[in-house]
């Protein structure tokens, strides 16, 4: 049976379109990215050969390549995931796509409470106590968040075993200081290998299970920055959907992992996880990588 939440057509003679409901379990599937056949029939072959442009009410836009399988047309995964990630989507939002011509679509976003999203979602978290305009506030908060994450990603609390690995790496650097320059790369690889191992003092053994620990701050209730060291050692180098489980195995959440040169983070779907776990500022969260794209989260209040 066809899921009626995905890609249904909106009948308008002048501006045809379609809608989608963003179910977290299917955010990146071909079905979710699909374009209704009845809508495709109203588009010329020439238009279909071009990229489609998704434009939201505050002016931002995303070009997305159109792909095809034997059954239907759909949006390319990379561009679609970028659109979801940049707008923090993935919590049962209702989206309408209205065709304005030349494969340019106006996208209207309605939150789960029915309210239309008219400004970037993350701007709602910016403090309004000063007289600065919204753009200045948004730029400043992201600058502060990035600085906090850069500091925390290298702190001992951000990565179990980091203190031990750091001291071991320091001894290695001292012992290699008199060696030739051609051995530098080899020593870096050895240091990286040592730092990827965390020490478990309780059973006096080495644990190879990758994990990191973060203390929840205000920004982490919106999206979660991944510590730089952990990201370099264990995380994928492209946007990927992760499944995060609670310790009891009764609940799990699909969360979008966004990769870039400047910052890597969990975004679309993270707000829902934070709400349902009841995360608060000051909580300590430990994330254990149990599969390449699955994690276990433990929360200490």
From Swiss-Prot:
CDD domains: B3_DNA (cd10017). InterPro entries: B3_DNA-bd, DNA-bd_pseudobarrel_sf, REM_fam. Residues 133-142 have a biased composition (Basic and acidic residues). Gene3D superfamilies: DNA-binding pseudobarrel domain (2.40.330.10). It comes from the Eukaryota. GO terms for molecular function: DNA binding. One of its GO terms (cellular component) is nucleus. Keywords: DNA-binding, Nucleus, Repeat, Transcription, Transcription regulation. Residues 123-142, 153-194 are annotated as: Disordered. Residues 18-113, 209-301 bind DNA. It holds the Pfam family B3. It is found in: Nucleus. This is B3 domain-containing protein At5g18090. It comes from Arabidopsis thaliana. The lineage of its organism: Eukaryota, Viridiplantae, Streptophyta, Embryophyta, Tracheophyta.
């Amino acid at each position: 049976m066809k899921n009626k939440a995905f890609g249904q057509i909106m009948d308008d003679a002048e501006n045809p379109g379609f809608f989608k409901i963003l179910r977290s379990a299917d955010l990146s599937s071909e079905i979710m990215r699909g374009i209704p056949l009845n809508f495709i029939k109203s588009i010329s072959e020439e238009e279909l050969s071009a990229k489609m442009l998704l434009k939201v009410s505050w002016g931002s836009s995303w070009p997305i390549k159109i792909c095809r399988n034997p059954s239907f047309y759909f949006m390319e995964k990379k561009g679609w995931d970028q659109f979801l990630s940049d707008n923090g989507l993935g919590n049962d939002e209702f989206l309408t796509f209205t065709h304005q011509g030349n494969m340019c679509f106006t996208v209207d976003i309605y939150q789960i409470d029915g309210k239309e999203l008219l400004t970037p979602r993350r701007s709602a978290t910016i403090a309004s106590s000063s007289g600065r305009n919204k753009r200045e506030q948004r730029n400043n908060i992201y600058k502060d968040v990035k600085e906090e994450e850069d500091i925390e990603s290298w702190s001992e609390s951000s990565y179990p075993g980091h203190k031990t690995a750091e001291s071991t790496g320091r001894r290695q650097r001292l012992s290699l200081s008199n060696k030739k320059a051609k051995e530098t790369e080899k020593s870096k690889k050895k240091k990286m290998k040592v730092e990827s191992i965390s020490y478990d003092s309780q059973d006096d053994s080495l644990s190879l299970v990758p994990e990191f620990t973060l203390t929840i701050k205000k920004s982490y209730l919106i999206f979660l920055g991944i510590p730089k060291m952990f990201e370099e050692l264990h995380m994928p180098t492209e946007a990927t959907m992760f499944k995060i489980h609670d310790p009891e195995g009764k609940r799990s959440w699909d969360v979008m992992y966004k990769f870039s040169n400047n910052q890597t983070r969990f975004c679309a779907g993270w707000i829902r996880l934070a709400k349902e776990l009841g995360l608060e500022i000051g909580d300590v969260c430990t994330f254990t990588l149990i599969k390449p794209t699955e994690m276990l989260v433990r929360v200490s209040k």
